[in-house]
Amino acid sequence: MKAVLLVVAALFLAGSQARHFWQQDDPKTSWDVVKEFANKYVDAVKESGKGYVEQLDASSLGQQLNLRLSDNWDTLSTILTKLQADFGLATQEFWDTLEKETEWLKQIVSEDLQDVKHKVQPYLENFQKKVQEEVEHYREKVRPLGIELRDGARQKLQELQEKLTPLGEDLRDRTREHVDVLRTQLAPFSEEMRQRLAKRLEELKDSATLADYHAKASEHLKMLGEKAKPALEDLRQGLLPVLENLKASILSSIDQASKQLAAQ
């Protein structure tokens, strides 16, 4: 299972080659994608949390208990931002180490992908050429019908539609044939790529790299937890005033309710 995870990690880190197989633009790095997602998530939590706090303060229950949660929200938001920054630095260090440790596997998989791409390219180009020929052939058949429509106006619209229908069906059927041919041609290469990945996985299982990586990954995860502790403690300390205020408000309301019942 650890070997599978390592291969998946390498493939993810090699995503700049695999996901952008046919693109020329420089893709985002793996860490940039993770960091962007995390930042958006934390920002969304802070914004939605602030809205919920304001709604709770404005509610009849909030006013009755005198919660005043909004007074502490800015402090909590600051602590959460600090937690986000501290955790991000520790996570980036772990991610950079993971990328460095799997560079060799990423390079091998990238070479395999490029090799298969080189073999598949002629079939893709031939498929594109065939489809373009079919479309051009269809245009040649349709062109005189368009001229006929302009000359015959509305009364021939139905007749034109009847003539176009079989032409469109013919184009669809011929394109399907080319797709089936392409699928048959590419099937061996798909199997070849599967076998190559299986071979890399077996090589990885038999190497000492996996055990070494597991030890390093465990060490970095432990370091990540240690670095996150101070920020989590700050968050806990920031929550204490809110919880104490909430507790005091609830106890005060219970005490008032008890006095009212006793007075009756």
From Swiss-Prot:
Sequence repeats lie at residues 67-88, 89-110, 111-121, 122-143, 144-165, 166-187, 188-207, 208-229, 230-240, 241-264. InterPro entries: ApoA_E (IPR000074), Apolipoprotein_A1/A4/E (IPR050163). It comes from the Eukaryota. The modification Methionine sulfoxide is found at M193. Keywords: Cholesterol metabolism, Glycoprotein, HDL, Lipid metabolism, Lipid transport, Lipoprotein, Oxidation, Palmitate, Phosphoprotein, Repeat, Secreted, Signal, Steroid metabolism, Sterol metabolism, Transport. GO terms for biological process: adrenal gland development; amyloid-beta formation; blood vessel endothelial cell migration; cellular response to lipoprotein particle stimulus; cholesterol biosynthetic process; cholesterol efflux; cholesterol homeostasis; cholesterol import. It is found in: Secreted. Glycosylated. Palmitoylated. Residues 1-18 form the signal peptide. Participates in the reverse transport of cholesterol from tissues to the liver for excretion by promoting cholesterol efflux from tissues and by acting as a cofactor for the lecithin cholesterol acyltransferase (LCAT). As part of the SPAP complex, activates spermatozoa motility. Homodimer. Interacts with APOA1BP and CLU. Component of a sperm activating protein complex (SPAP), consisting of APOA1, an immunoglobulin heavy chain, an immunoglobulin light chain and albumin. Interacts with NDRG1. Interacts with SCGB3A2. Interacts with NAXE and YJEFN3. This is Apolipoprotein A-I. The gene is APOA1.
